[in-house]
Every structure is written in C-alpha cells, then in structure tokens.
C-alpha cells in the first residue's frame, strides 16, 4: 500500500492538462493502485484523478460503495439531461458548492488491463465521471460553481 500526497488547489499541477497514457503497464497499474489506497485513506472521498496526486496522466479511480472503477484515458462521449449537484473535492478541503452536471454520461476508456470499455453512469456516478475528467483538463469544480454552501 502506497499513499500519495493529495495536492491542494493552490498547486499549479491541478491547472494543467494531463497526458494520455501510451501503454497500460505495471507502472500504470501501480499508480492506479496507489490512487485507490490514497482515496480509501480519505474521510469521505469517492473518486480521485491522477493530477490530485501530482501525476499528469489521464487516470481516474472511482470507489462508490463496493464498486471500484479504474479508468485510463477516459473521455465523455455522451451526455444526457441535467442535474443540480453539490460537490466538494479532496484538493479543496471544506469547500462545497452547487453546480449543474449532466444527469447521465457515457464514458469510453481503457481498463487497468488496457482493454477498451464503455461505461454509463447516472446521478452520483455521472457526477463523479464529470468531476474527475474535468481534473484531467485542469478544471476544478469551483470554476463551475453557481452557489457556494456555507
């Protein structure tokens, strides 16, 4: 188990675009495992993107309940509907805000074995997909907030 330091909002790495992963190898799988360990060591985190642990690669880990999703080079290929959500972020502790996200999204990515996968998420999972893929483009949820929650 390797815990990585979560980068905070003032870290400029969070504003940079992540690079696609060329080959899904043991090194990439280790980073994904470290990201999962780091996520599971947080108080109430549901997902994490590689830039949040200082790595500019297109990697995302989502842990919702018993489901663990590891994504390499994820791209949103379809959005449906709209929902108002409340979000927070491991990189911006104790800040929460309302924003609009698609109600349903479809994502294409590679899994940790380098196989192409397509996943569709609704509600909370759709929000996670959008939030984490935004991180890969240097976008923080605070860029999209319509109202902060005290």
From Swiss-Prot:
<keyword id="KW-0648">Protein biosynthesis</keyword>
<dbReference type="InterPro" id="IPR023635">
    <property type="entry name" value="Peptide_deformylase"/>
</dbReference>
<dbReference type="GO" id="GO:0042586">
    <property type="term" value="F:peptide deformylase activity"/>
</dbReference>
<comment type="similarity">
    <text>Belongs to the polypeptide deformylase family.</text>
</comment>
<feature type="binding site">
    <location>
        <position position="135"/>
    </location>
    <ligand>
        <name>Fe cation</name>
    </ligand>
</feature>
<dbReference type="Pfam" id="PF01327">
    <property type="entry name" value="Pep_deformylase"/>
</dbReference>
<keyword id="KW-0408">Iron</keyword>
<dbReference type="GO" id="GO:0043686">
    <property type="term" value="P:co-translational protein modification"/>
</dbReference>
<feature type="binding site">
    <location>
        <position position="131"/>
    </location>
    <ligand>
        <name>Fe cation</name>
    </ligand>
</feature>
<dbReference type="GO" id="GO:0006412">
    <property type="term" value="P:translation"/>
</dbReference>
<feature type="active site">
    <location>
        <position position="132"/>
    </location>
</feature>
<protein>
    <recommendedName>
        <fullName>Peptide deformylase 2</fullName>
        <ecNumber>3.5.1.88</ecNumber>
    </recommendedName>
</protein>
<keyword id="KW-0378">Hydrolase</keyword>
<feature type="binding site">
    <location>
        <position position="89"/>
    </location>
    <ligand>
        <name>Fe cation</name>
    </ligand>
</feature>
<comment type="function">
    <text>Removes the formyl group from the N-terminal Met of newly synthesized proteins. Requires at least a dipeptide for an efficient rate of reaction. N-terminal L-methionine is a prerequisite for activity but the enzyme has broad specificity at other positions.</text>
</comment>
<keyword id="KW-0479">Metal-binding</keyword>
<dbReference type="InterPro" id="IPR036821">
    <property type="entry name" value="Peptide_deformylase_sf"/>
</dbReference>
<dbReference type="GO" id="GO:0046872">
    <property type="term" value="F:metal ion binding"/>
</dbReference>
């Amino acid at each position: 188990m390797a815990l990585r330091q979560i980068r905070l909002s003032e870290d400029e790495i969070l504003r940079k675009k992540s690079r696609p992963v060329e080959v899904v190898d043991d090194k990439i799988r280790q980073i994904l495992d470290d990201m999962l360990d780091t996520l599971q060591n947080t108080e109430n985190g549901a997902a994490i993107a590689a830039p949040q642990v200082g790595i500019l690669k297109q990697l995302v880990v989502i842990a919702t309940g018993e489901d663990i999703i590891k994504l390499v080079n994820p791209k949103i290929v379809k959005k449906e509907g709209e929902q108002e959500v409340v979000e927070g972020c491991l990189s911006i502790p104790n800040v929460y805000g309302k924003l609009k996200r698609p109600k349903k999204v479809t994502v294409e990515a590679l899994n940790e074995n380098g196989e192409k996968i397509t996943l569709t998420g609704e509600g909370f999972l759709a929000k996670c997909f959008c939030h984490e893929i935004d991180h890969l483009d240097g976008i923080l949820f605070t860029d999209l907030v319509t109202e902060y929650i005290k």
